């Protein structure tokens, strides 16, 4: 290297031009995807284009557990509470996940309500036009039925109203950080302290 020139930092192979990724098919690919979506919508009519109904779940881990999103499927417990047989659920556009567990009553109740709302709005077409079975929708409902495009029953994230309060001297006197640190320490030493207390009790009995 000589003179006051820029030091090159391009780490290319000898024939790097042969491996350049091009995107000339992007507009055609966009059209193909659009046509495929339209064909699928026609094929699955009158079912919604967005696919089966999914539950509202909380994300995993400390980072995401405050956020709600759509899950894989409803639990057997939720279906039972909503009065929907597990074998019927997939046939009427409700996804099922036998592995998911309900860990809170609030989550269970919200998903049961979601199922009930869906069931109330549901229009069920008979398998054969001439043989109408119990549970199928009326001819009038069938005539007015339309295919739902895009998202249906979207998750509405409610903004919690915040109440402004004036800081009191009592509030200022409490150090929240110190309190959390103390409780963490207590939790960490709980086992050792319990063992020490048990050993001391044994010594006293001797």
Curated annotation (Swiss-Prot):
Keyword Ribosomal protein annotated: yes
Signal peptide positions (record): none
GO biological process, one term: translation
Domain of life from the UniProt record: Eukaryota
UniProt KW keywords: Ribonucleoprotein, Ribosomal protein
Basic and acidic residues: compositionally biased ranges: 196-206
Any single GO CC term annotated in Swiss-Prot or TrEMBL for this entry: ribosome
TM ranges: none
Family: Belongs to the eukaryotic ribosomal protein eL13 family.
Region (Disordered): 182-206
InterPro entries assigned to the protein according to its UniProt record, in alphabetical order: Ribosomal_eL13 (IPR001380), Ribosomal_eL13_CS (IPR018256)
Basic residues bias: start-end ranges: 186-195
Protein's name according to its UniProt entry: Large ribosomal subunit protein eL13y
Gene Ontology MF terms in the entry: structural constituent of ribosome
């Amino acid at each position: 290297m000589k003179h006051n020139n820029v030091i090159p930092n391009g780490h290319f192979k000898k024939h790097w031009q042969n491996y350049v990724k091009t995107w000339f098919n992007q507009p055609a690919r966009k059209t193909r995807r659009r046509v495929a979506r339209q064909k699928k919508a026609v094929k699955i009519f009158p079912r919604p284009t967005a696919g089966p109904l999914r539950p509202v779940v909380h994300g995993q881990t400390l980072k995401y557990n405050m956020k709600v999103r759509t899950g894989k499927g409803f639990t057997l417990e939720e279906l039972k509470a909503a009065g929907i047989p597990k074998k019927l659920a997939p046939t009427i556009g409700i996804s099922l996940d036998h592995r998911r567990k309900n860990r809170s009553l609030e989550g269970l109740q919200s998903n049961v309500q979601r199922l009930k709302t869906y069931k109330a709005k549901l229009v069920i077409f008979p398998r054969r036009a001439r043989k109408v079975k119990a549970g199928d929708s009326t001819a009038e409902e069938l005539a007015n039925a339309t295919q739902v495009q895009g998202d249906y029953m979207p998750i509405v994230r409610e903004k919690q109203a915040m109440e402004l309060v004036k800081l009191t001297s009592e509030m200022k006197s409490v150090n929240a950080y110190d309190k959390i640190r103390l409780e963490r320490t207590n939790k960490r030493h709980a086992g050792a302290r319990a063992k020490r207390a048990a050993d001391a009790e044994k010594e006293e009995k001797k």
